[in-house]
Regions:
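Bacterial N-terminal signal peptides that target proteins for export
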Residues: 1-10
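Gly/Pro-rich, tryptophan- and cysteine-flecked surface segments typical
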Residues: 23-171
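N-terminal signal peptide c-region/cleavage motif recognized by signal peptidases
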Residues: 19-21
Length: 171
């Protein structure tokens, strides 16, 4: 009798757990709205996002479109889950206006040697996180950088890979 109670309890617990799903980060988190006038699209996924020990992550994106768009940089923790910043909250939290033909830089924080058009406010340390680059235009090219925060001529600056819609180059 005790075995059937325990086994019934385990089945109930398994059913309860099966009904809850955890977000896996940039792969399945809901895409937020970053504009009242156009739909938001996931353009790129960025692994290796760091905001720690004097290193910041920046994305530099250029519009190839003939109309203005909105651009956003959404950061995720190493363990996945929902985004660490709310890009739907507007400028100052990883979202910028992207005029036609313009280039904009969004960073996890300020750095002496790199110009940022916007930084993500109130973002804590991120060690080996990830990100999504979102826009209201699909005609946007981006690159990513890891940059030393304090150097006017950064001793550390390197590009990071950015993947179009979860695919690496050559896939």
């Amino acid at each position: 009798m005790n075995a059937s109670i325990i086994s019934g309890g385990l089945v109930s617990a398994a059913i309860a757990l099966a009904g809850t799903t955890a977000l896996a980060g940039p792969g399945d988190s809901p895409v937020p709205s970053i504009s009242a006038f156009a739909s938001t699209r996931v353009l790129y996924t960025v692994p290796g996002v760091i905001k720690n020990n004097g290193i910041e992550t920046a994305i530099i994106c250029t519009s190839l479109d003939t109309v203005a768009a909105t651009l956003a940089f959404e950061v995720f923790a190493p363990e996945g889950g929902g985004p660490l910043n709310d890009v739907s909250a507007g400028v100052g939290n990883g979202t910028v206006a992207l005029p036609a033909g313009a280039t904009e830089t969004i960073s996890t924080g300020t750095s002496v040697g790199l110009h940022e058009d916007a930084t993500i406010s109130a973002l804590g340390n991120v060690k080996n996180g990830s990100a999504r680059i979102l826009s209201t235009s699909t005609r946007v090219l981006c690159t990513g950088l890891l940059v030393e925060k304090l150097g006017s001529t950064p001793a550390t600056i390197t590009t990071i890979k950015i993947f179009a819609r979860r695919k690496q180059n050559g896939d």
